[in-house]
Amino acid sequence: MTSVQIEAISTDSKDIPLQEASLDIWDKKYRLKSKTGDIIDQSIDDTFKRVARALANAELTDELRNKWYDSFLWALRRGAIPAGRITSNAGAQEHKPATSTINCTVSGIINDSMNGILEKVHEAGLTLKAGCGIGYEFSTLRPKGAYVSGAGAYTSGPLSFMDIYDKMCFTVSSAGGRRGAQMATFEIGHPDVMEFIRAKRENGRLRQFNCSLLITDEFMAAVEANENWPLAFPINEAEAAELDLDNADQVLWREWPHSDGYVCRDDGLVACRIFKTVPARRLWDMIMSSTYDFAEPGFILIDRINEMNNNWFCENIRATNPCGEQPLPPYGACLLGSVNLTRFVEKPFTDEARFNWDEYHKVARVFTRMLDNVVEINGLPLGKQRDEIARKRRHGMGFLGLGSTINMLRMKYGSPESLEFTEKVAREMALAGWEEALELSREKGPAPIMKEEFEVTGDMLRQRPELEADGYKLGDKVSGRVLHARYSRYMQKVAEINPELVDALAEEGARFTHHTSIAPTGTISLSIANNVSNGIEPSFAHHYSRNVIREGRKSKEKVEVFSYELLAYRHLVNKRAMPYAEDEASKLPDYFITAEDVTPMQHVDIQAAAQRWIDSSISKTANVPTDFPYEDFKGIYTYAHAQGLKGCTTFRFNPEAFQGVLVQERDLENTLYRFVLDDGQVVEVKGNEEIEYDGEMHTAANLFDALKEGYYGKF
């Protein structure tokens, strides 16, 4: 295990040197090296210069390129951190020409045919090879046992085809050296939904996927009312002759990703054959039990996502990127970046601690232009992906280090003042971004979708009744910029703060359709930001172990790390301070709380405070104690729905099911792992004990997980 020595050496938290684990991750993931391994980025500042130059080169003249290179470098040095694909690949085309600067993509619709399934496997392989994560909806495939007339046989169902995607992802990521990332989403009303919920209980199955359910408001209402829930799949035109479409016991009408080949009404709803009904609460308990034990499936509130989507008039979102912060349409793509909030804290840990809002606003404005320029060097492998990002110019700016910043301002994460601070951070970022969206539109032109004309449909009138109140009728033409600025629920909220800005955006069009998103930021928080808290999270712990994939090792390696705020406190206040210290002179202040000190409801409250001003979504995990009561656990999800979230994820330490990336030392100390040897002998060891196996030293917990999940020796 790596050991880090820390000493008090500075009076400025911004001057704290990177800890060994941070430098190591930067070196392995983001530092540019030649094909022969020669180092090109000599320092992190060289990485910043490479990225700033690559993005400034998207400007039209030499004068603008030089001007914005200086501004971009200024912002990077003051806390703007582009996402991993940008930091790793921008300006690196000479050395890795086939890589992308885009983190997030979603597959095209997987059509219910062998050609459709295999076509999307091929496209996904190219996408993963380029370094992008990808999401898919698999509930577009007919249920297990359904008759396939062309083959004269019965289908094996969506889950069996997911196995093909899983193997493809593992193969591509193993060959490319970077682990592939995939999200599988699944409709709560699909006949195979229960098989989807149970899928990952099988050791080693679908481990290249995060799995999430598309939860509708209708389902949540059925749970609340203790009603039955129909499981149904669309009816094609041939099947329609065998059914009475007006019989509510046989057919229901619901939204579907596409209507090609299916029976469809004028309001856009698709006829679906009811295969069976189940008590909604029974299905709910099945979801909750799986999530309690295995932290999956995730919980995506899809109606909320589509209701709040800025592109509500031309998109029906059914999938997200692998971490869930970017709900995207078919072939959708989005670039990411995060602002390190700790960089704006002045006089931390004192009565005079304050946040520099003016500089934060300025960095957010400059960073918005920087991220907009990434569209020009996206490197996406598929033409449909490139067309989609060029048409809408979506990006997702978020922040990281919220928990660390709250500590440095002497607040407690989850307290009323921290909720107020979180909402203001998100609101100020949003306002800065839309101000820049207007300026960029005036300088460079709006996103092409803003200049398009859209025909008013029955579906649009159903979603936005105010269109009719404003005099629009079926068949009228309305510009994209008006539908975006006037009728997006999110932009209507922005108009409450700055109506003149939104009026101008409706008149001229914005440079992009979406601006904000909060990613988990795990590796950039640990590396470039010196282990500030991830994204919107509190610090997991102030001194803990992180399991990292190390090239050449057969299991994950445990690395010792310290939170940024602990390093800062030791530099500025007390060099002997450590968590759990018994000596009074070494204790930390009571506001130095961690994820385990935050209640699940406080996690939801923080997410809700930010979500009001985030136009995409938020990747966040509510940590739950191992002994947290199951009935209370279910309440987290109903509370998340009531608070207006777009999704919810929980994590409860359960070593029998899986080993997390971030691990508390005392959890390992208190957990016994049982190994059965070839001769039948049983050996029990604590999770944090070092044991030798296959010529290497491993922690017991990591070796157990690698053998159980089937990835031992395959990194």
How would you describe each model-predicted region?
Residues 1-101, 250, 255-271, 284-291, ...:
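Acidic/polar, glycine-rich intrinsically disordered N-terminal extensions of enzymes
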Residues 7-16, 102-357, 380-384, 388, ...:
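Active-site cavity-forming subdomains of large catalytic enzyme subunits
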Residues 18-28, 73-94, 188-189, 368-377, ...:
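Core structural elements
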Residues 22, 325-327, 371-376, 446, ...:
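Catalytic alpha/beta core of large soluble enzyme barrels
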Residues 87-92, 357, 381-392, 405, ...:
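Active-site-adjacent structural elements in folded domains
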Residues 234-235, 363-386, 412-521, 618:
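Internal maturation/activation junctions in enzymes
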Residues 333-397, 407, 581-587:
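Long, charged, mostly alpha-helical binding arms that flank functional sites
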Residues 409, 417-436, 528-551:
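Catalytic phosphate/nucleotide-handling subdomain of diverse soluble enzymes
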